[in-house]
């Protein structure tokens, strides 16, 4: 799906089957890989809203504002300013030019397991069969062109990987 400049749309991801409780989850929307070139920037669409379903708890984060989502990301290690993360800022005009909107980095959500509403007897790394799904509202912050949208979810687990004598073993 291509999203026009400054347009917003809601997307729903396909449910992801998980067998272990993750440490954190990254969610972002960006230009589709198939349309990236050497001339396109590594930026993201602005995330306006999120409603996440995990461990039979639906609607998580659905009442949060853009500022609330940014605060979660900042708490979880994001070092972007609010303007950079939310994707837009204004230039200062002068007597010859009017102020203009400038697209910035855009939003990547990092949700720590502690941010999720999960049962108190469940912790990161536990073997629990579950599904993760979400509906996300995004906005194309590119000021000039439509962008084909790609949703990405990165689920992070704690673990240990050992590389020795050319072979690898892992413990999750």
Question: What is each of the regions a protein language model found here?
Answer:
Residues 1-172:
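Flexible assembly/topogenesis modules
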């Amino acid at each position: 799906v291509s999203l026009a400049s400054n347009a917003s749309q809601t997307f729903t991801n396909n449910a992801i089957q998980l067998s272990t409780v993750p440490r954190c989850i990254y969610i972002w929307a960006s230009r589709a890989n198939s349309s990236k070139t050497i001339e396109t920037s590594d930026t993201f669409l602005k995330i306006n809203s999120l409603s996440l379903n995990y461990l039979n708890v639906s609607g998580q984060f659905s009442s949060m504002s853009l500022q609330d989502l940014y605060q979660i990301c900042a708490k979880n290690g994001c070092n972007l300013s609010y303007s950079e993360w939310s994707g837009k800022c204004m230039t200062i005009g002068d007597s010859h030019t009017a102020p203009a909107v400038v697209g910035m980095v855009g939003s990547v959500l990092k949700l720590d397991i502690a941010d999720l509403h999960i049962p108190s007897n469940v912790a990161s790394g536990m073997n629990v069969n579950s599904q993760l799904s979400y509906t996300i509202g995004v906005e194309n912050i590119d000021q000039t062109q439509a962008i084909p949208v790609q949703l990405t979810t990165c689920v992070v687990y704690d673990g240990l990987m050992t590389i020795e004598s050319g072979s690898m073993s892992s413990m999750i």
